[in-house]
Amino acid sequence: MITIKIGGSIVDSLHPSAIPDIKKAAAGGVVLVHGGGKEVTKVCEQLGKEPRFVTSPGNIKSRYTDKETAEIFTMVMSGRINKCIVRMLQQHGVNAVGLSGIDGGLIRAERKSRLVIVNERGRKQAIEGGYTGRITSVNSELLETLLGKGIVPVVSPIAMGNEYELLNVDGDRAAANIAGATKSERILFVTDVDGLMMDEKLVSRLSAAEAEEIRPKIGPGMEKKVLAATEALKMGVREAIIARGSRENPVSAAIAHENCTVIGDG
């Protein structure tokens, strides 16, 4: 059993062998979670909605999501991107079903009442939390029902709040929670780089403790993946892998630990 997170920006640059490779992995059970932040930003701009990003004191950059942005986020992620991926899988004979975290109460989250950010002056500032959520539960029974019928769930990271509102949750961390809930053996983050780079060199392996230690020294995009990786390990996932999606057979190569970053104590 493997949970695969694919960054929305690399869907179009996946190697032609990627989908057939996912089909092979599906025999053992696959849940696919996708991102799509760049596409959301593009559509926001097309609709005249200026995207806003904030940075936490821990140097994590994220989208500030007001109600209108949450609606655009849902439209793009659960519509355009999700269905594009499902179509690609179906085209290669994979019985895939597209879901958002709203469907079947798949991902529940608690709406953040406030966010602490670092403002333009470099000072901490508390702002209204908007429509951003902290994941509280995953409906693993729904996923297991689909997996038991040989179906590949394709999940967009939109969560349902306590008041049934749409909430934006981080895709990497949503994948980590899904991996933990489904007792996945591993989680794979498919990206546009070979893995974690330090001093221009690929880090091939890290223990969970080493990953926690170096996380503050990593750039914002990769830092989120390392954070999600360590969270997945704490939830019982055996290993987390960060690998490039544009290489041949990216899933099989990552599982074989070829030219990627593996995080875990195994």
From Swiss-Prot:
Family note: Belongs to the acetylglutamate kinase family. LysZ subfamily.
GO MF, one annotated term: ATP binding
Subcellular location: Cytoplasm
Pfam families linked: AA_kinase
Binding site for substrate: G36, G37, R63, N168
Function (record text): Involved in both the arginine and lysine biosynthetic pathways. Phosphorylates the LysW-bound precursors glutamate (for arginine biosynthesis), respectively alpha-aminoadipate (for lysine biosynthesis).
Main location: cytoplasm
Family matches, as InterPro entries: AceGlu_kinase-like_sf, AcgluKinase_fam, Asp/Glu/Uridylate_kinase, LysZ
Site (Transition state stabilizer): K5, K225
Keywords for the protein's UniProt record, in alphabetical order: Amino-acid biosynthesis, Arginine biosynthesis, ATP-binding, Cytoplasm, Kinase, Lysine biosynthesis, Nucleotide-binding, Transferase
Species for this entry: Cenarchaeum symbiosum (strain A)
Protein name from the UniProt record: Putative [LysW]-aminoadipate/[LysW]-glutamate kinase
Catalytic activity: [amino-group carrier protein]-C-terminal-N-(1,4-dicarboxybutan-1-yl)-L-glutamine + ATP = [amino-group carrier protein]-C-terminal-N-(1-carboxy-5-phosphooxy-5-oxopentan-1-yl)-L-glutamine + ADP; [amino-group carrier protein]-C-terminal-gamma-(L-glutamyl)-L-glutamate + ATP = [amino-group carrier protein]-C-terminal-gamma-(5-phospho-L-glutamyl)-L-glutamate + ADP
